[in-house]
Amino acid sequence: MLEINDFNAIRISLASPEDIRSWSHGEVTKPETINYRTLKPERDGLFCERIFGPTKDWECFCGKYKRVRYKGVVCDKCGVEVTRAKVRRERMGHINLASPVSHIWFVKGTPSRLGLLLDISPRNLERVLYFASYIIVDVKEDMLQVAREMVQEEYAARREKIQKQAEEKRIELSTQLTQDLGGMETAQRSTQRQIEEDYRRQRDELVGEAERLRERLEEMSGTLADEDIIFRGVTVVEEGELINDNTLDQLDELVEQELEVLEERRRRDLADAELLTDAERERKAYEATQEQERLQERLQRELDMLVREEKEKLEQLDKLKVGLIITENEYRQLRDVAPGVFRADMGAGAIRELLERHLNLDKLAEELQAEIQTSQGQRRKKATKRLRIVEAFRKSGNRPEWMILTVLPVIPPDLRPMVQLDGGRFATSDLNDLYRRVINRNNRLKRLIELNAPEIIVRNEKRMLQEAVDALIDNGRRGRAVSGKGKHRLKSLSDMLKGKQGRFRQNLLGKRVDYSGRSVIVVGPNLQLHQCGLPKKMALELFKPFVMRRLVERGVAHNIKNAKRAVERVRPEVWDALEEVIKDYLVLLNRAPSLHRLSIQAFEAKLIEGSAIQLHPLVCAAFNADFDGDQMAVHVPLSRKAQEEARTRMLSKYNLLSPAHGEPIITPSQDIVLGCYYLTMVRDGAKGTGKRFASIDEAMLAYEKGLIDIQAPIWIRMNGSISGKSDRPVRELPPASDGTPRMVIETTIGRVLLNSELQPPLRFRNRLIDKKGLKEIIADCYQYYTSLRNLSEAQLNEVRAAHGNKHVQELARIYGSEMTAQQADRIKTLGFRYATLGGMTIGIDDIEVPAKKYDIVREAEQQVAEVEKQFRRGLITEEERYQEVVRIWQEATKQTIAAVKENLNPFGPVAMMSTSGARGNINQISQMAGMRGLMSDPTGRIIELPIKANFREGLSVLDYFVSTHGGRKGLADTALRTADAGYLTRRLVDVAQDVIINIEDCGTEEGLWLHSADDGELMEKLQVRMLGRILAAPIYDKTTGELIADRNTEIDEELAEKIIAAGHESVFVRSPLTCQAEHGLCRMCYGRNLATGKLVEIGEAVGIIAAQSIGEPGTQLTLRTFHTGGVASADDITQGLPRVQEIFEARVPKGKALLAEIDGVVQIIREDEGVRKIRIVSTNVYTDEYPLTRGFTPVIESESDVYEGQVIAEGPGGEQIIARLSGKAFIQSDRIIISQEDHEERELVVPHNARIRVENGDRVMAGQQLTDGSANPQELLELQGREAVQRYLVNEAQKVYRSQGVNINDKHIEVIARQMLRRVRIEEPGDTGLLPGELIDSAEFRRLNNDIVSQGGDPATAATVLLGITKASLNTDSFLSAASFQETTRVLTDAAIQGKVDYLRGLKENVVIGKLIPAGTGIEKRLERQHEDLISEMARMLEEVQQAEKSAEPTTTALPTTNGHQAPQSDTDALLRARLEELLSGGNDHDDEEDSDHPDLSSL
């Protein structure tokens, strides 16, 4: 195996099938795990010993070979290699898949990597992979042409056939019509004949009948008719009428008429018959025509349909291209249309074939580049995304088809163990179930393929295999998650990595450790600052191995076994051994939650009886510990290096200052403060008041004799002078003969006692010492003793003797820390002693209710009654009434607090506790003795009924009920806040974890202006803000011009005072925000390390410190948004923790303020519907003057409009003056002025609840706030640029913390802000090979551009991007860091495709792979290694130069040695290295980063 520390970068990429097989020790073919009778692994199963190694050390499966002497032998019977059982943690197996399957990470991620590469939508890709659609994987172009021709021929034949059929039908119709018409002619003639015959017959009948009647009449002529004689219905002769010739004439007439009627009928019938025939003929002709037309239409339809079908089929053939997705129906049709032309398939096999055979990455990259150049909008965006993936594959050497698995790796069995439980049942890792499903399905698929099963069954089995592999890799990512017994979701390989319980966060970034224990803590008031009390039995367990060894060394036990027995029986000698052992070891104490680095500190252990750990009271603040049941963990650092680190860096006495703000964190509190306050109080009129003493000893004697009280004001003569202010009279005396100052001072014995415990340089403090005073003492002590000015050589030598020969600054820090620790311990002892002697207790009688309270309440009640009366009369609204009532009661509460304060006895224990800062404040005392005042309901709205009682008087039921709201909300808030603050800290740590001080100076000229104008209620004074910074430019005295300090000078307390005294209101300092270091920060830009008060050392992990400093006070911040009077208004802006998250996540803030988009003048517009608008008008006037000399005359009118290029004046010789810009021309006696007005307007709609900050006519700048609220940092970046946003982020974060009384130094927020603004987004890539829209580190961007410019190419352009801390963490260069933060699978997917290399520059990535972190003491090794690499590289470069010179100039060369003599060529190598070593060791303090990265070779 490779040596664990023998690499400095780690690469992740896709594994090829060959890689997977090369890792494997054999194929797993059976789903069995172990045999339940023999409890031995099954052969070829998931726990097979042949593949994964033996289950017992040095013993094969069958037992033929046992013992270590057969090491490396492979048993000929069972095939198991004789080796250690632990190989089962590292040996892998594999499964040969019967059908390729896709890797779900590359399919289901967003965006789908496979989909982007193949340009297939994720939905379609899924349909193909899960056997719902076909995808075309191959098209034969030559056969495609043949198929086209065949289709065309087929349709041509079909067209011909149809047309032929139509022609035949047409002829048939025509013949039919002719026949029909002929038949009609015949019928017509027959009808005419019939009519003629009928006519003749009827005529003959008529004539015959007439003849017969005539004959009869002629016979009867001259006679009278004996009856009516009728002819055809007409009476010719009536009865009794005479028959004569007239009668015959009449008959002839009738016959004539009848004949006419017959003739008429004949003509009519003939005409009708003809008409009927014509009509019938026309009908037949019409029907024939219709039929012809129908036939024509049908023909046309059929032809059109054929054309359409042909077109569709040809189109289908034309569309036939590799990668086309088709449904099953379409596949069948196409197969019929073009058999053998194409091949379509389903599943991962089809996709693999596409990737392997048809994806030309180089060609695709060129096409996408061209598309990016020519397209816009969504198309360009998509092309960029695709190009990014294509380029990733091209550069990384990964093959796209490796995203499809043909071989599945099987992880070692000991990483997915199977253990027997008590009841004989087995518990197994979920992975075994998931692997078993894969193997079962794979084996079934193999059998089905062998049996030539129907396609549909095989396809279904392939789909099930795909789903089984999906579940193994990432269960639940697609479809329903596979669940085991009891419905629980099986944990897949991805789940093993993801989340808090995943491999990264559970086992790599956080581990359980041996040599640790935990117990309850109790106070250890007699301990020194660097000590802790460790229970004996706990210590014995922790140091057991060491004690055993010591017992053997001392001869108490003969061997380790005896020693172990002795320890277990706790023989008396064991305790002596333990005492000896423990002297050499420090232990680490840790209290969870570890919110900052002071939550783990090192202590010397003192053995104590009992079972609780004793903790020094002064370190409680750092641990945030109290003694109400808190527990702490103890750890033993084992190695010599770890012990050394604990002793030099982690010992509690070296951690006196808070890294967040540089003030002491070892500050006396509570009892100690109370004791010191009691001691330094002056009680006028106490016993002995006014007495005078010649010396301190005399006064102490009087006190011990009981003549004076400890708090009595007395006069004492003493040597020395007052330190700071004095609250009692002081009279200076002439100095003593040796020059010692002397004075007579009014003080108390208590103050003398306190001062006697102070280090001499800190005396004499003659004032009331409260908590703040004690803090000052500690700070002054540290400052005094760490300043080299105040230390003698003897003191430094004393430290040297104890701590070795270190840098003088480091020695001063150690000495100062030790002196301060001693001082703190002395104050602690004194405070506890006098808190006890003073006997300050608190009882119910100490709380007196002031008589004024009742008057205040009565008056308030009257005012409220008056307001109610006005409301009932309708003079004020409900809202105004509510606001006024709340105001009255708030005022009453204020007055009550004042009355309570006034009423307090300053010497009473309650007042002393409050005013000294030991415990409690005036508000709490007021709740006990005054009135509780107004409460708010669960929404945060103030309830207008106050609680008029106090705790001394007792609350009524209603009062108590109203109080519960606030109490419950407080508890809920605290619980929520803790989790939120923890998560915020985690994100901050993640974004800043690689910010380490790496170099001395980055050489930047940039910096940050600090202005005194920014001083305010919430911001600290300029003098405080500039402390510990490094000047970015020289600073001079304003009046004399004398240099006060040069660039790169650290601003200490003295220099800060000088700068302020010189009247400077702004200082230009270096800042992490402007640091140009490529990785991490440089010392100069960071400045002072607040935890030591000295310039930061190389290797300090300032990013982590910044994150902890911001995150640790997070729990103190309020959670909710504030509601003013319960009514949501524009004031309802987020505060507290949510606001901090809003700032660091760069989110659009709630209640966002409107910002001016351009410089200009404001106009406020109010419209009818209550809509308000702000219009900003920007008018810029440009003028251009043209002198009229030598007889030039204008050719334009004054105040006329002219355009650019127009002639405005001409000279006597025809010379012309041309207008250079368009605008209005004004003619004066000797010149023409053209004035151009540039007019721009922006209109913004004001939200209805926003308060406008500007007035009509105000001038505003771009980026200025127009309404109340918080600005959106993204808009600010756009409008005002990077600097403005940096300033905004720092100031806004500080506002939140300062408003809660939390002090954090600006530079911590600057470190985080720098990380948020580290990236730039590429706009135009130039010749850099970057992609538009790509995010890249700004240092990398600068380096790339410099390289390109030096080669004469076009540089890229980019815009700064503001990322929230979560986004910034995920965009880090280290994939290990990003993957262990969030979205593990997405980060690893991208990193694998890109073949990313992690150079292990941050802390997390080194912790993950188990290397020393590149910070603190861990950076030394790294620097040594870089040093060696640099020397080797430079030596190589020099050799190359010499080789080139040699080949150009064939003379022997010699190099100058360090002393100037010539060295023969043979010694060159050794000489070169020695010279380079010398140069580099001399050049450690580089002024410029570039020097260290690119050494000047000319000097060699």
UniProtKB/Swiss-Prot annotation:
The cofactors it requires, by name, are: Mg(2+); Zn(2+)
| Residues the record lists as binding Mg(2+) | 626, 628, 630
According to its UniProt record, the EC number is: 2.7.7.6
Cross-referenced Pfam families, in alphabetical order? RNA_pol_Rpb1_1 (PF04997), RNA_pol_Rpb1_2 (PF00623), RNA_pol_Rpb1_3 (PF04983), RNA_pol_Rpb1_4 (PF05000), RNA_pol_Rpb1_5 (PF04998)
Biased composition range(s): Polar residues:
1449-1468
Q: In which residues is Zn(2+) 2 bound?
A: 1002, 1075, 1082, 1085
Report whether Transmembrane shows up as a keyword of the record: no
Q: How is the cofactor bound?
A: Binds 1 Mg(2+) ion per subunit.
Gene Ontology biological process: DNA-templated transcription
What are the alphabetically sorted keywords of the record? Answer: DNA-directed RNA polymerase, Magnesium, Metal-binding, Nucleotidyltransferase, Transcription, Transferase, Zinc
Write out the GO cellular component annotations. DNA-directed RNA polymerase complex
Catalyses which reaction? RNA(n) + a ribonucleoside 5'-triphosphate = RNA(n+1) + diphosphate
- Binding site residues for Zn(2+) 1: 60, 62, 75, 78
Ranges for the region named Disordered are 180-199, 1440-1500
Q: Which domain of life is it from?
A: Bacteria
Q: Which SUPFAM superfamilies match?
A: beta and beta-prime subunits of DNA dependent RNA-polymerase
Please describe what this protein does.
Answer: DNA-dependent RNA polymerase catalyzes the transcription of DNA into RNA using the four ribonucleoside triphosphates as substrates.
Q: Which HAMAP family match?
A: RNApol_bact_RpoC
Which PANTHER family would you find in this protein's record? DNA-DIRECTED RNA POLYMERASE (PTHR19376), DNA-DIRECTED RNA POLYMERASE SUBUNIT BETA (PTHR19376:SF54)
Subunit record text: The RNAP catalytic core consists of 2 alpha, 1 beta, 1 beta' and 1 omega subunit. When a sigma factor is associated with the core the holoenzyme is formed, which can initiate transcription.
The name of this protein is DNA-directed RNA polymerase subunit beta'
Name its species. Chloroflexus aggregans (strain MD-66 / DSM 9485)
